[in-house]
C-alpha cells in the first residue's frame, strides 16, 4: 500500500475531509473527495482546493464528486462526514468498495466505528484520531491551522501490517500518521 497506486476516497469533504484529502493529493496520492455540497464540489473541480494557513496559501488539484458511482473501486475510505449523515453516506458508496477496502474514521466522538462496522463488516474498519484542525472559509476554501499528527490502529488494539503500510504511505504523502498500539486510548487522550 505504500505507493501512489493506493486509491483513497474521503467521505465528507468538509474542513477536515478537505484537509486530509488535500494534503495527501498535494504529494501525489490518488484521492477523491466525496460530498453532497454541490457548490463546494464544483468549486474544487473548477479551481482546485484553496488551502490557506499552515504551509502557505495555495490551490491543490484534487478531484471531488457528489456521485461516487463514477469513481471505480477504492483501497481506503477516510470517513469524515457528520455523524448524522454517516449511515446514508456509507450506503451511498457501496459500489466503490471491494473485499479489501479499509475504512478509517477520524470523526470527533465515539461510536462511529461501530456504525461503520455494522454496514461494511468488522474486518474492514480501523480506528483513527487526529489533532489536526481546519475550518471552511467558503466553497472550495479551507484554513489549515497546523501540522499536527494523527493516529491509526486496529480498532480492537494492535499494529498490523496494514496499519504500518497506511501510516507510512500517508506520512510519505504529507499527512503525519502514527501507528498506535491502542487507538481507543489515544482517542480518549485527545
Identify the residue ranges that each predicted region occupies.
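Internal alpha-helical scaffold of NAD(P)-dependent oxidoreductase catalytic cores
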Residues: 96, 119-124, 137-139, 143-190
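Active-site-adjacent segment of FAD-dependent monooxygenases/related oxidoreductases
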Residues: 54-58, 155
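Short, charged/polar "capping" segments at the starts of alpha-helices
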Residues: 40-43, 113, 160
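Residues at the C-termini of beta-strands that transition into short coil/loop
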Residues: 35, 68, 107, 129, ...
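NAD(P)+-binding Rossmann beta1-loop-alpha1 motif at the extreme N-terminus of oxidoreductases
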Residues: 1-50
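Rossmann-like NAD(P)(H) cofactor-binding subdomain of soluble oxidoreductases
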Residues: 58-141
